[in-house]
């Protein structure tokens, strides 16, 4: 669940999410400062994580969508995150190196321990992501679509 809507709608959604004692939920940083603050004001103990750019996007996508290079768009979103009350950042492992001085939670999707042919364009292994400063990793299909889910989980924990 990645929230991205007008501030009032995001505020009400986060208010509902927070009632379930959820540890973290995500919002798109592209929703802007007012939306971020609306989410935080309703979060209670739930941490609000700001999604930077989806791991399925690359340079061509950001140029087409935002008229910016990937790096410029990422920098704009991280600058917004730094000046906001967001508790953490969701970004691909490839961008972690630029966040070493950021004192916020770092959640990293796009984790692949083997070469895959899926829609993830900016990936890294779990070990590489942790070495680059990830606090949490997100592994989806390599686990949920594995023939042996327990073995797949062990592979990512190793």
Positions of predicted regions on the chain:
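N-terminal organellar transit peptides
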Residues: 107-109, 128
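Short hydrophobic alpha-helical runs that function as membrane-insertion/retention elements
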Residues: 90, 137-139
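Conserved anion-binding
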Residues: 5-97, 102-105, 112-116
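Internal alpha/beta core interface subdomains
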Residues: 131-136
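Conserved, mostly hydrophobic/aromatic
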Residues: 2, 25, 81, 129, ...
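Short glycine-rich, acidic/polar surface loops and turns
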Residues: 95-96, 123-128
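Catalytic-face loop-and-helix region of soluble metabolic enzyme cores
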Residues: 109-122, 139
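C-terminal helical cap(s) of enzyme catalytic domains, especially alpha/beta-barrels
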Residues: 36-42, 130, 143-158
């Amino acid at each position: 669940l990645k929230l991205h809507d007008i501030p009032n709608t995001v505020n009400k959604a986060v208010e509902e999410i927070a009632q379930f004692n959820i540890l973290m939920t995500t919002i798109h940083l592209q929703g802007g400062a007012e939306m971020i603050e609306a989410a935080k004001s309703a979060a209670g103990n739930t941490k609000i994580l700001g999604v930077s750019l989806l791991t399925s996007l690359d340079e061509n996508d950001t140029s087409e969508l935002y008229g910016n290079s990937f790096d410029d768009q990422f920098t704009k979103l991280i600058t917004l995150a730094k000046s906001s009350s967001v508790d953490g950042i969701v970004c691909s492992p490839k961008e972690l190196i630029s966040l070493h001085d950021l004192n916020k939670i770092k959640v990293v999707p796009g984790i692949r321990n083997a070469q895959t042919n899926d829609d993830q364009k900016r990936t890294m292994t779990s070990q590489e992501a942790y070495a680059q400063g990830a606090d949490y990793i997100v592994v989806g299909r390599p686990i949920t679509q594995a023939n042996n889910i327990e073995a797949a989980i062990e592979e990512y924990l190793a």
